[in-house]
């Protein structure tokens, strides 16, 4: 990948290095194997064509944040693409729990649960060439977000790559195929930003490449309609917490012009929770009281959820 020599090293996904991650055990189709020995077939549908669904899960104080919601979203996505996971929801939750437990993790950890359609007879996109059942992998790592992104905030760049309409590719589906988001992120990095802000097919603000995007105007919290972005669980939780705290929320279309004149901005995601945004397309935005309040509310929720 060709990146600018001045490319940013900061993102909402940035985390503190932890040597313990070199020794983690990875769940692969019912077995736990050392990270260095974890393997899947080169004929796996996820590798061949990005055919699969996934979830990111955060462990805080021995609890997986919004566990039921994540598992529900996983199964909804699998049904959408006619993928039989072959396990019940409880069995999937047990896989995640056991992966954390086998690695001695109780706090400050994050797991990526990945399920693909399985191995193919030949490398093509046709699901009729699948041999056997799905491939299920769970990677748990010690992950604590770096303080830098929270303290200085993120710099965003508005990408020319748009979020697609549902009749093209429904981005509310948490699929393995993320190429459009990756392209947008590369464009943003080469423009000197940390992450990409993306518009919907009609030119309204949609989301960032890996997080949901919010602004604050007149003390109210605004976010997109949700029609053209991933169905963020942290997003929905933050909206609920804001309403419970008496903060006005608005889900709907808004323009770049309205975003540029916002008082505050922030992004949400499973790993980073709430991360402030301090610059979009070179225009400064302050880290303000609404973002700080919501960050506190969400951290308290994650510690108890």
Could you tell me what each predicted segment is?
Residues 197, 204-226, 231:
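Glycine- and Gly-Pro-enriched alpha-helical subdomains that act as flexible
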Residues 1-197, 201, 230, 235, ...:
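Conserved alpha/beta cores of soluble small-molecule-handling proteins
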């Amino acid at each position: 990948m060709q990146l600018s020599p001045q490319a940013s090293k900061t993102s909402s996904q940035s985390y503190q290095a932890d040597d313990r991650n070199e020794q983690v055990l990875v769940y692969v189709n019912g077995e736990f194997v050392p990270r260095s020995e974890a393997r899947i077939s080169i004929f796996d549908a996820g590798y061949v064509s990005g055919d699969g669904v996934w979830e990111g899960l955060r462990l805080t104080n021995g609890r997986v944040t919004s566990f039921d919601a994540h598992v529900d979203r996983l199964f909804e996505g699998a049904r959408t693409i006619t993928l039989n996971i072959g396990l019940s929801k409880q069995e999937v939750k047990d896989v995640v729990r056991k992966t954390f437990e086998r690695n001695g993790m109780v706090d400050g950890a994050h797991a990526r649960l990945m399920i693909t359609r399985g191995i193919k007879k030949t490398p093509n996109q046709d699901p009729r060439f699948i041999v056997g059942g799905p491939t299920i992998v769970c990677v748990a790592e010690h992950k604590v977000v770096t303080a830098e992104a929270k303290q200085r905030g993120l710099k965003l760049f508005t990408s020319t790559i748009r979020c697609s309409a549902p009749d093209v590719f429904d981005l509310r589906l948490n699929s393995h195929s993320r190429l459009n988001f990756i392209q947008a992120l590369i464009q943003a990095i080469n423009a000197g930003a940390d992450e990409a802000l993306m518009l919907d097919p009609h030119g309204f603000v949609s989301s960032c490449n890996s997080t949901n995007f919010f602004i604050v105007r007149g003390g109210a919290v605004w976010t997109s309609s949700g029609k053209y972005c991933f169905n963020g669980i942290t997003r929905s939780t933050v909206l609920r917490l804001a309403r419970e705290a008496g903060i006005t929320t608005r889900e709907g279309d808004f323009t770049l012009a309205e975003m540029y004149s916002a008082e505050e901005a922030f992004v949400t995601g499973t790993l980073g929770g709430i991360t402030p945004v301090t610059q979009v397309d070179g225009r400064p935005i302050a880290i303000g009281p609404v973002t700080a309040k919501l960050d506190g509310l969400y951290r308290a929720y994650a510690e108890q959820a």
